[in-house]
């Protein structure tokens, strides 16, 4: 069983043993995830989050596979990673009706009939939120290491437009050892980030504006580095795609690997837009850089392909493309360094997560340049929270707060009519991005272990940064113990590294 499988099994047993809610008609718990219910959605008592999940699943005709393969995963609102397949089955088994999901209605200038008998009855029943039990509070505090936001999607678009507010929970993360933090980052699926637009943030330049400028610089640098068009057309910072259709060319994996350090350097320059970066130590900065590189390698091809408008091509950062329609076509040919078979085995799954999970959401909402910039910044900083030392995590939380506040202000300044809907869609996309990131790391570790092809040395160090940092921390602790005259024994318990008694 993999580490992730063991983690999910432990979480499942813990939640099952600690939470046994009485089955009574007077309970106001969600029948799917045991959160506070907000009403009857699709004929089943549930919370807004489960209702939104069910609506999207039915409306988009999604199908899921159980993450453990057993189809018996526990579903609880406090868990970091909820199996979507088992959650959907639980929605159906508890009475949710797919027929109740209606297609999107045109905008009609009519108000919602609030004062109906059923509405008054529902509001009276679910108006009082049931307090968390002691066990629930303990599990949330112990199990959540990332500030968690729950932007619960209301039952209808009208609710979104009228409420225009976000339900936010930010539990205090428990103190964990550095080794636990490093190793957990590769197996734990991150929660959606949790700042409040009302949270206090230090005064300064608008953070979204800063990242928009940096993103435009990034596009200009890519044209200079990788485009072969006339020199007079290379300069200029704008919000358009850095490449035109005639600029893109078939991707050669070998050539892309040779330029990998250039891409990492561009990401580091992007990251330095954050002033507080210099307050972190070297390991914290490197941890944040690792997450930023990973997020850029997932989101940049998604947005470049969206901007180019070629649905059968995935455009990489250097302007190279691979075919998304024919996995034996352009970009998937045999190369000296890597065979076409290995390309398809390790990179088609990553590509499909981009084209099937990330890009459709961008296309459905017709994501703007500003929204993409905010999405990428949110994913980088919230994803990097896990591996930053506990003493500096408040800086990450403040930055995430600033980004979300800035995005909300951007909507207001541009008179966006569907603020809550678009804001919520941005936040909900983070889950798929983090899942794709975990799979990306695991695939490349397998490539390294089985020597499928030679990865760049810097990439290998970033992939294994958690192990490197754990080793450094252990060696530092051993040296400190030896100076204090404490016996330190290695993992095999056969080599004595320190002496309890110092001989004079």
UniProtKB/Swiss-Prot annotation:
Subcellular location: Nucleus
Alphabetical GO biological process terms: determination of adult lifespan; lipid metabolic process; negative regulation of transcription by RNA polymerase II; positive regulation of fatty acid metabolic process; positive regulation of transcription by RNA polymerase II; post-embryonic development
Region named Disordered: 177-199
Keyword Nucleus appears in the UniProt entry: yes
Biased composition (Low complexity): 177-192
Alphabetically ordered keywords of this record: DNA-binding, Metal-binding, Nucleus, Receptor, Transcription, Transcription regulation, Zinc, Zinc-finger
Expressed in which tissues: Expressed in the intestine and in some head and tail neurons, as well as the ventral nerve cord.
SUPFAM superfamilies: Glucocorticoid receptor-like (DNA-binding domain), Nuclear receptor ligand-binding domain
Residue pairs linked by disulfide bridges in the UniProt entry: none
DNA-binding annotation, residue ranges on this chain: 27-103
PROSITE patterns according to UniProt: NR_LBD, NUCLEAR_REC_DBD_1, NUCLEAR_REC_DBD_2
Function text: Transcription factor. Binds to regulatory elements and regulates transcription of target genes, including acyltransferase dgat-2. As part of a lysosome-to-nucleus retrograde lipid signaling pathway, acts as a direct nuclear receptor of oleoylethanolamide (OEA) and, acting in concert with nuclear hormone receptor nhr-49, activates the transcription of genes promoting longevity and mitochondrial beta-oxidation. Required to modulate expression of delta-9 fatty acid desaturases, thereby regulating lipid metabolism; in some contexts, acting in concert with nhr-49.
Family recorded in the similarity comment: Belongs to the nuclear hormone receptor family.
Subunit structure and binding partners: Interacts with nuclear hormone receptor nhr-49; the interaction is direct.
Protein name in the entry: Nuclear hormone receptor family member nhr-80
Gene it is expressed from: nhr-80
């Amino acid at each position: 069983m993999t580490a992730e499988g063991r983690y999910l099994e432990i979480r499942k047993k813990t939640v099952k043993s600690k939470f046994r809610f009485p089955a009574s008609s007077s309970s106001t718990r969600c029948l799917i995830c045991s959160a506070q219910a907000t009403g009857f959605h699709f004929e089943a008592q549930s919370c807004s989050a489960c209702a939104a999940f069910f609506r999207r699943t039915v409306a988009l005709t999604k199908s899921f596979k159980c993450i453990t393969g057993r189809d018996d995963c526990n579903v609880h609102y406090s868990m970091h990673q909820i199996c979507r397949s088992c959650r959907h089955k639980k929605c159906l088994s508890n009475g949710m009706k797919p027929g109740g999901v209606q297609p999107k209605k045109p905008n009609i200038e009519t108000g919602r009939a609030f004062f109906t008998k059923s509405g008054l009855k529902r509001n009276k029943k679910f108006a009082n939120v049931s307090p968390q039990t002691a066990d629930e509070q303990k599990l949330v505090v112990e199990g959540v290491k990332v500030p968690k936001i729950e932007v619960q999607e209301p039952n209808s678009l009208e609710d979104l437009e009228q409420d225009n507010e976000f339900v936010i929970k930010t539990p205090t993360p428990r103190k964990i050892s550095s080794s636990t933090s490093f190793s957990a980052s590769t197996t734990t699926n991150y929660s959606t980030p949790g700042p409040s637009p009302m949270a206090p943030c230090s005064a300064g330049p608008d953070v979204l504006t800063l990242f928009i400028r940096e993103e435009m610089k990034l596009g200009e640098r890519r044209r200079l580095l990788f485009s072969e068009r006339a020199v007079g057309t290379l300069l200029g910072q704008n919000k358009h795609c850095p490449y035109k259709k005639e600029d893109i060319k078939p991707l050669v994996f070998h050539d892309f690997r040779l330029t990998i350090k250039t891409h990492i350097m561009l990401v580091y320059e992007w990251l330095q837009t954050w002033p507080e970066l210099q307050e972190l130590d070297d390991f914290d900065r490197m941890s944040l850089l690792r997450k930023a590189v990973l997020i850029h390698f997932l989101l940049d091809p998604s947005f470049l392909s969206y901007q180019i408008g070629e649905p059968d091509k995935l455009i990489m950062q250097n302007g190279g493309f691979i075919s998304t329609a024919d996995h034996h076509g352009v970009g998937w040919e045999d190369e000296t360094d890597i065979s076409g078979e290995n390309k398809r085995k390790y990179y088609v799954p990553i590509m499909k997560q981009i084209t099937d999970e990330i890009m459709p959401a961008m296309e459905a909402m017709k994501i703007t340049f500003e929204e993409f910039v905010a999405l990428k910044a949110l994913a980088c900083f919230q994803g990097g929270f896990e591996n930053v030392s506990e003493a500096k995590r408040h800086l990450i939380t403040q930055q995430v707060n600033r980004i979300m506040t800035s995005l909300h202000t951007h909507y207001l300044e541009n008179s966006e009519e569907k603020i809550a809907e678009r804001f919520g869609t941005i936040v909900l996309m983070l889950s798929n991005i983090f899942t794709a990131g975990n799979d990306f790391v695991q695939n490349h570790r397998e490539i390294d272990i089985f020597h499928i092809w030679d990865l760049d040395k810097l990439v290998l160090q970033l992939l294994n940064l958690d192990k490197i940092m754990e080793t450094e921390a252990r060696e530092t602790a051993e040296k400190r113990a030896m100076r204090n005259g404490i016996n330190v024994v290695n993992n095999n318990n056969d080599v004595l590294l320190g002496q309890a008694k110092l001989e004079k």
